[in-house]
C-alpha cells in the first residue's frame, strides 16, 4: 500500500480549513483578557503598603485630561515605565508595564502635548496617576 493516501489524509487533518476558525473578535477578547489580568495584577501591587495619604485620590483636571487622551497612551506608558525605576520594591510593576504596550489602542494622530509628569521617587503620585490611567484603559475596553 502506498503512503501517499495516508500523507494526504494527514495533511487534510492538520490544514487550517478543517480547524475551527478563530475570529478576530475571539482573538481580541482573548488578548483583552490577558491585558485585563495584567492591569489587575498591577493594581494589586499598587494597593500594597505603604498606603497613600487621605487626599490620595485628588487628581487635578489637567492630569486627568492627559491620562485619558488616546494619542498619549504610549507616551504616558513610557513615562510610567521610566518613573517606576525610581521607586523601591516596584520591580513586579516594572516587568508588567513592559508587557502592556500591545494592550494600548493605536493612536489616531500625533500627540499634541507632553505625556504625564510623575514626581521622581513619589510612590503616591505614581500610584494615583497609574491607577487612573489603568482604569481609563479598562473603561474604554468595556464600552
From Swiss-Prot:
Disulfide bonds join 35-103. Residues 1-19 form the signal peptide. Keywords: Cytokine, Disulfide bond, Glycoprotein, Growth factor, Secreted, Signal. GO terms for molecular function: cytokine activity; growth factor activity; interleukin-3 receptor binding. It comes from the Eukaryota. Gene3D superfamilies: 1.20.1250.10. Glycans are attached at residue 89. Activated T-cells, mast cells, natural killer cells. Its main location: secreted. The keyword Aminoacyl-tRNA synthetase does not apply. Monomer. This is Interleukin-3.
